[in-house]
Amino acid sequence: MFQYTLYGDGIHDDTAAIQERIDSGACEVALPVPEKHYLISKPLTIPSNFKLKLPRYAVIRLADGANCLMLQNKTVLRDEPDPNVFYYGRFSASRAHTCHDFEIEGGIWDFNNQNQEANPIQTGHFDDRYYLGHVMCFYNVRNFRLSNLTIKDPANFCVTVDTGSYFTVENITFDFNFGNPIAVNMDGIHLNGNCHYGVIRNLQGACYDDLVALNAHEGTRGDITNIQIDGVFAENCHSAVRLLTVEEKVEHIHISNVYGTYYQYCIGFTKYYPGETTGYFGAISLDNIHAAKSFRLPIQEAHMQNKTRHFPLIWMQDGTVVKNLSIEHFHRREYVNPIDTIRVDKGACVEQLWILDLSLENHTQSHCPKLTNHGTIQTLRTEGLPAEEIENTGVIVNLRCT
């Protein structure tokens, strides 16, 4: 029936055989349990109205020296590429060319990063081969689901979504063991600009950068709105969630049920890139956060020029604008690092901040602040956090503590 043999022996290349089955016209392909593991040397390309299913713990591995994505959606090339947008600028963003209604389920997706080229963010090697170091990349997509799988040892990000709407990413395990060349810039689920109406839930395992990133000023750049993140579980992870904007809106975001220890920050409102801040974070809700700091291991700080700099668990970076933020049911039991629990940096502006039910058990030998403000807070409302426990060197215009 098929021209290409599906081996699954870990020796022969299975790329053509798997892609042939994907392209067969069937609406679903379920790969059998492999003899050893599947081996691919080129990206698998997923069309609309299609589901690819692997046995939950079947390994699919990127061949040595493949230097490519493992999986991508079907795209249409633009007549005139956008020279200002690397990789994504080649593809059409037209609704007529959207890849839609597809699903990937199961498998252990092993990028085999020690046997690929190094992370291009570290090497600066961005050329016309478009090697990203990502495991999976989705562009101009709608109504898709990624579920019940493990992603192992990427060179860069595990999953990147750019210009995507109405999606679910759930029940994902991260298995990170090495960096190439170093353990940094290795995100879990990474959203670039123009992503809306998504659910990201039940993510487990530590990453060597942001476990979830909502980075509006990256890729095609654009607003990120209406995203629910529910259930992040990680021990000794870089960070749980980063939100990032310079010129864009990041709003209507709900982050809940975050557990674990984090060596950089737990949730960060960041700018990172230079330029005038014209964008903002708005209508952000954080609740049921159980987090503390962890020690940084040598592999995790090898790239750091300043190893003495530490970040709070909830961080509003210099240059950011937060219109409204609520933090409810935040519980910290700290044994490692008494850095601030919540901090607004100098040069950051928060228009409305609500804090309800913030608890701290400090088992270190040093003072551990609950809330530190070096910036500007227009309106601050707290319940259970008295004014005398707020460390303020900035400006708080309206303060109400009950």
PLM regions: where:
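Extracellular/periplasmic carbohydrate-active domains that bind, remodel
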Residues: 1-402
